[in-house]
Amino acid sequence: MGNELLSTARIYTFKIPDAYNNVIDFDQFKNKVILIVNVASLCGFTPQYKELQLLYEKYHERGLEILGFPCNQFGNQEPLQEEEIVESCRRNFGVSFPIMKKTKVNIDCDGHESELYKYLKSEKPGEVGFKGVRWNFEKFIVNRKGEVVARFNSLITPLQLEGFIEQLLSE
């Protein structure tokens, strides 16, 4: 029982820099639904930013937080610097949700990997038990209790998650 409580509360222990190096303390997300997405500017899935923003505008006041984590591990599709990424997202998709510092969502050849993503993947392994993030715009959802309750691949669009998000916000 104690390990279960530790596991569910662990999401709130993370402190991660945003694109401007401001530290975001995940403790502020207690009692909120969090959608965590690894993003890239030059990916075929990049238009998903628009749907993410629509969800953010519609549900932020009810407790939805969306965090975009730029990642350059898939086909070098995020070559921009952090501030350029934010500017591109705002200009092209009207993004107002937080964009974080570039992140290693999977372990690289030097052994570097985001502790947050290591945690998310351990809580919700991917398809057929594959733990690694397969591509840009893979999504993790954390409920109001801090539990990682779902993981969706890149083919699932943000708007396809709307009903699930509404359900979690109602809990």
From Swiss-Prot:
Q: What is the disulfide pattern of this chain?
A: C43-C89
Q: Which GO terms describe its cellular component?
A: cytoplasm; peroxisomal matrix
Top enzyme class, one word, equals oxidoreductase
Do the record's keywords include Transport? Answer: no
- Keyword field: Antioxidant, Disulfide bond, Oxidoreductase, Peroxidase, Redox-active center
Any keyword Disulfide bond? yes
Q: Which PROSITE patterns match?
A: GLUTATHIONE_PEROXID_1, GLUTATHIONE_PEROXID_2, GLUTATHIONE_PEROXID_3
List the Gene Ontology MF annotations in alphabetical order: glutathione peroxidase activity; phospholipid-hydroperoxide glutathione peroxidase activity; thioredoxin-dependent peroxiredoxin activity
Knockout consequences: Sensitive to hydrogen peroxide. Unable to filament and thus, escape from murine macrophages after phagocytosis. Also displays defective virulence in the Galleria mellonella infection model.
Question: Which reaction(s) does the protein catalyse, per the Swiss-Prot or TrEMBL entry?
Answer: a hydroperoxide + [thioredoxin]-dithiol = an alcohol + [thioredoxin]-disulfide + H2O
Its EC number(s): 1.11.1.24
SUBUNIT field? Interacts with CAP1 and probably YBP1.
Q: What else is known?
A: The active site is a conserved redox-active cysteine residue, the peroxidatic cysteine (C(P)), which makes the nucleophilic attack on the peroxide substrate. The peroxide oxidizes the C(P)-SH to cysteine sulfenic acid (C(P)-SOH), which then reacts with another cysteine residue, the resolving cysteine (C(R)), to form a disulfide bridge. The disulfide is subsequently reduced by an appropriate electron donor to complete the catalytic cycle. In this atypical 2-Cys peroxiredoxin, C(R) is present in the same subunit to form an intramolecular disulfide.
Q: Which PANTHER family match?
A: GLUTATHIONE PEROXIDASE (PTHR11592:SF78)
Family the UniProt entry places it in: Belongs to the glutathione peroxidase family.
The protein in question is named Glutathione peroxidase-like peroxiredoxin GPX3
